[in-house]
């Protein structure tokens, strides 16, 4: 997960092997569930924070390679755009003063990283969508170095077969097309990863879905994109559309997108258990 991809071209045989590998992994996962082989005694969580890099004027700074070299901390990694980086906070056990300790550790890491990034002309900014990002910042040239993101771009467009349509109607309306998935780079977030036991997975999943609206109401911070005022939380629509492999015909047929909120409750960790 997250490793660089060395292969430049994927054959039909590669796709078949990949599908078989996924099925094998699902079979192993199902067996582990049946045999209760998951650790339920050590409850832990992790945190991932995606950030934007800006220059002195507040515009996107295509400088994550230089910034990461200056930061020199393995917890900080690239994200899809050259003006993005992320910090992967090591997992912690849920006990004692863990949240206070987490806050202190994250603040210290971010402050130190920002100080070092500024040495190469980059400032770290935590915001859902950087208001200054424009179409010129979201092209194929904006991808981070390496093959990982360009391969993702190629595979999404191979499945889709046409440009991405970005259509968001809010206070103002945005209607445009993109020939890469670079608009995804505009969306940054904080992601909490909670380890739960299989028996409690459904309750945690359903609870997360139930409070999603309240979380958005409290934490929405991406009203602007491409100079237009759209949704209070534009990331929802933008991320869904920027990763959509469906052409218009499949949308009309009711095929689900790659990214969405879901539509019903679940009763267990089994992917077939929905109500």
For the regions a protein language model found, what residue spans apply to each?
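Phosphate/nucleotide-binding catalytic core
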Residues: 1-275
């Amino acid at each position: 997960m997250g490793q660089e991809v060395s292969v430049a071209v994927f054959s039909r045989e590669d796709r078949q092997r990949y599908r078989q590998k996924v099925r094998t992994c699902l079979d192993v996962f199902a067996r582990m569930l049946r045999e209760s082989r998951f650790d339920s005694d050590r409850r832990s969580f992790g945190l991932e924070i995606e950030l934007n890099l800006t220059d002195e004027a507040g515009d996107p700074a295509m400088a994550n390679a230089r910034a990461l070299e200056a930061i020199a901390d393995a917890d900080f990694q690239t994200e899809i755009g050259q003006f993005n980086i992320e910090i992967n906070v090591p997992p912690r056990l849920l006990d004692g003063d863990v949240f206070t300790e987490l806050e202190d550790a994250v603040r210290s890491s971010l402050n130190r990283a920002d100080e070092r990034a500024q040495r190469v002309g980059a400032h770290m900014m935590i915001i859902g969508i950087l208001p200054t990002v424009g179409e010129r910042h979201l092209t194929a040239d904006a991808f981070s170095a390496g093959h990982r993101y360009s391969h993702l771009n190629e595979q999404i467009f191979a499945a889709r077969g046409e440009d991405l349509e970005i259509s968001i109607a809010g206070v103002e309306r945005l209607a445009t097309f993109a020939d890469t998935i670079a608009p995804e780079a505009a969306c940054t977030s904080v992601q909490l990863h909670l380890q739960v036991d299989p028996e409690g997975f459904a309750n945690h999943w359903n609870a997360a879905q139930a409070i999603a609206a309240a979380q958005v109401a409290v934490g929405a911070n991406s009203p602007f994109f491409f100079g237009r005022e759209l949704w209070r939380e534009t990331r929802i629509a933008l991320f869904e559309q920027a990763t959509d492999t469906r052409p218009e015909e499949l949308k009309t047929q009711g095929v689900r997108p790659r990214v969405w909120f879901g539509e019903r409750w679940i009763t267990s960790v089994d992917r077939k258990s929905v109500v």
